[in-house]
Curated annotation (Swiss-Prot):
Protein name stated in the entry: Receptor-like protein 44
Signal peptide start and end residues: 1-24
Subcellular location: Cell membrane
Gene: RLP44
Pfam families: LRR_1, LRR_8, LRRNT_2
Originating species: Arabidopsis thaliana
Keyword Signal attributed: yes
PROSITE patterns per record: LRR (PS51450)
Length: 274
């Protein structure tokens, strides 16, 4: 191979490498484009989320999209919290296959949690709390084996908590409080670790139709405290009544004794001296 051929191959390799670095992964591009199309942005917080940026959102570890974090040229974290966003979550979000953290909390997003999230196999953190999400919690979340955090509190989710979520071995934070969930809390989410439940009652409160441990234990403790309070009030009232009665008797005795002394004085004065 001549020197000119080697130089040509080197230039071609450099060109291909540079092209890969400056061109978005087609999956990430589809993910971002569809996510933006499904979201309404009345406060214009996503004004820089444009097609031109979607075609090149990352350069190594540098992100050109507000709310996005890059790792080796791929989107690996999306944090769009408290931006007054509306609309729904696009099922094409699953195209961001390197995504490890998704935080869309404290917005006004409605609709369902798309089952396609199951394809985010690297997902570790899912925070969709404080929105208007409805429908059931998709059991396909259990296929995201690396999930450490599932936070869905303060939504309008209904139905039962999927039993499969209890099989997520890495799950360390779980919160579905203040929804419209019903049925029994899955055993693997409520079982004890030593003397403590895996997730305590605060993870489940605010769901009128939900029952089972640890909610049941909290209610029993609450009832126990109520009974003790009633007994305490009763005892307190009884003691107070006794004290008042005792004080009244003492006063009556003192008044009676005083009258007797006065009467004895009068009698002694009226008797003649001998």
């Amino acid at each position: 191979m001549t020197r000119s051929h080697r130089l040509l191959l080197l230039l071609l390799l450099i060109f291909q490498t540079a092209q890969r670095l400056t061109t978005a992964d087609p999956n990430d591009e589809a993910c971002l484009k569809n996510l933006r199309q499904n979201l309404e942005d009345p406060a214009s917080n996503l004004r820089n989320w444009t097609n031109s940026v979607f075609s090149n959102p990352c350069s190594g570890f540098t992100s050109y999209l507000p709310g996005a974090t890059c790792n080796n040229g791929r989107i690996y974290k999306l944090s769009l919290t408290n931006l007054s966003l509306r609309g729904s979550i696009s099922p094409f979000l699953s195209n961001c296959t390197n995504l490890q953290s998704l935080d869309l909390s404290s917005n006004q997003i409605s609709g369902v949690i798309p089952p396609e999230i199951q394809y985010l196999v690297n997902l570790a953190v899912l925070n969709l709390s404080s929105n208007h999400l409805s429908g059931e919690i998709t059991p396909q979340l259990a296929l995201c084996a690396y999930l450490n955090v599932i936070d869905l509190h303060d939504n309008e989710l209904s139905g039962q908590i999927p039993q499969q979520l209890g099989l997520l071995a890495r799950l360390s934070a779980f919160d579905v409080s203040n929804n419209k969930l019903s049925g029994q809390i899955p055993t693997y989410l409520s079982n004890r670790t030593g003397n403590f439940p895996r997730f305590n009652a605060s993870s489940f409160i605010g769901n009128k139709g939900l029952y089972g441990y640890p909610l049941q234990e909290m209610m029993m403790k609450s009832k126990g405290l109520s009974v003790m309070a009633i007994v305490g009030i009763g005892l307190g009232s009884g003691i107070a009544s006794l004290m008042i009665s005792f004080t009244g008797v003492c006063l009556w005795l003192r008044i009676t004794e005083k009258k007797i002394v006065e009467e004895e004085g009068k009698i002694s004065q009226s008797m003649p001296d001998y």
